[in-house]
């Protein structure tokens, strides 16, 4: 597992992962991960960082190897670009602008916003905007930009992620709380001023330096790609796509069954039933009006052979 175990002490030192916050700005719960203090700054124990980071990378690879998805969350300024780039590279989802309350716990409502965003994008592409007044188009464009900013990273997320990766749990505490309520595992890059409670996979490290953020985010992305490759190699991706298609077909059949026969079919059925009853009533009347009883079809069929015999 190149991605799951591909992090070294040298990489951590070069990225400045070991630099924590000032000693007066610390959370006592991070004490087990602190090596010591130097010049009023806590130094993080990188040996523990290596072990815990590798464990997190393996977990992510296993998640994506089973077809699961990972949600990258980094809304602080120095994390936004890195998180967006790496999550996109890995084919995963991300939140970099602002965490909307209920993104996980009220995903049904979030999907309504996503549907609205897709509708506006379609209107812009198919020329609908060109037929609308300029003032209305400007309003719709502003709405689309706002939705893209907040929901663009989860636009293709059709179901809840199997894992959430956050930069700076102190800032992303709402996301962590929502994931905890739903039982979604959380991986976090946790600095010395953060509370590690609620983080399933703690990665002790500097969550402010861009190089540190880049290092761990890229490793998580590589773990996602590694797991996705295993998933495709196993053939599970094709099976899941087939099951999803069959599920859509089944849902369509159930909708048709609930609708019942079409109106035209019901009219045809009534006409057929009425014609049979009408024929039954008219049959005896014809026989009564005639001078002689009307022969049935069956005797005629039986009489045919006698006629043939006479001809012979």
UniProtKB/Swiss-Prot annotation:
Answer whether the UniProt record assigns the keyword Ribosomal protein to this protein: yes
Start and end residues of each stretch annotated as Disordered: 232-312
Citing just one GO molecular function, the answer is:
structural constituent of ribosome
Compositional bias, Basic and acidic residues, is annotated for 245-284
Ranges of Low complexity composition bias in the record: 291-312
Q: Which GO terms describe its cellular component?
A: cytosolic small ribosomal subunit
GO biological process terms held by the UniProt record:
translation
Q: Which UniProt keywords apply?
A: Ribonucleoprotein, Ribosomal protein
Ribonucleoprotein as UniProt keyword: yes
Homology family: Belongs to the universal ribosomal protein uS2 family.
NCBIfam families (alphabetical):
rpsB_bact
Q: What is this protein called?
A: Small ribosomal subunit protein uS2
């Amino acid at each position: 597992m190149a991605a799951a175990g591909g992090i070294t002490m040298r990489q951590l030192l070069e990225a400045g992962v070991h630099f924590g916050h000032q000693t007066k700005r610390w959370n006592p719960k991070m004490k087990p991960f602190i090596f010591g203090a130097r010049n009023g700054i806590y130094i993080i124990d990188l040996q523990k960082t290596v072990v815990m980071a590798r464990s997190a990378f393996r977990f992510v690879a296993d998640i994506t190897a089973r077809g699961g998805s990972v949600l990258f969350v980094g809304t602080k300024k120095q994390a936004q670009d890195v998180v967006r780039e790496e999550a996109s590279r890995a084919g995963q989802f991300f939140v970099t602008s602002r965490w909307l309350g209920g993104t996980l716990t009220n995903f049904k409502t979030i999907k309504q916003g996503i549907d609205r965003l897709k509708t506006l994008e379609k209107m812009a592409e198919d020329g609908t905007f060109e037929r609308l007044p300029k003032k209305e188009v400007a309003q719709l464009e502003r709405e689309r930009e706002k939705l893209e900013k907040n929901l663009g990273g989860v636009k293709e997320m059709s179901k809840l992620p199997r894992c959430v990766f956050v930069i700076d749990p102190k800032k992303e505490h709402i996301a962590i709380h929502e994931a905890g309520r739903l039982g979604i595992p959380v991986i976090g890059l946790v600095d010395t001023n953060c509370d590690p409670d609620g983080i399933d996979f703690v990665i002790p490290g500097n969550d402010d330096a861009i190089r540190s953020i880049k290092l761990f985010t890229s490793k998580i992305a590589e773990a996602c790609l590694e797991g996705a490759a295993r998933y495709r190699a196993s053939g599970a991706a094709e099976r899941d796509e087939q099951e999803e298609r069959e599920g859509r077909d089944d849902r369509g059949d159930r909708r048709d069954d609930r609708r019942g026969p079409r109106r035209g079919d019901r009219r045809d059925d009534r006409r057929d039933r009425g014609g049979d009853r009408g024929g039954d009533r008219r049959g005896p009347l014809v026989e009564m009006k005639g001078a002689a009883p009307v022969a049935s079809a069956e005797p005629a069929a039986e009489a045919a052979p006698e006629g043939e015999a006479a001809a012979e």
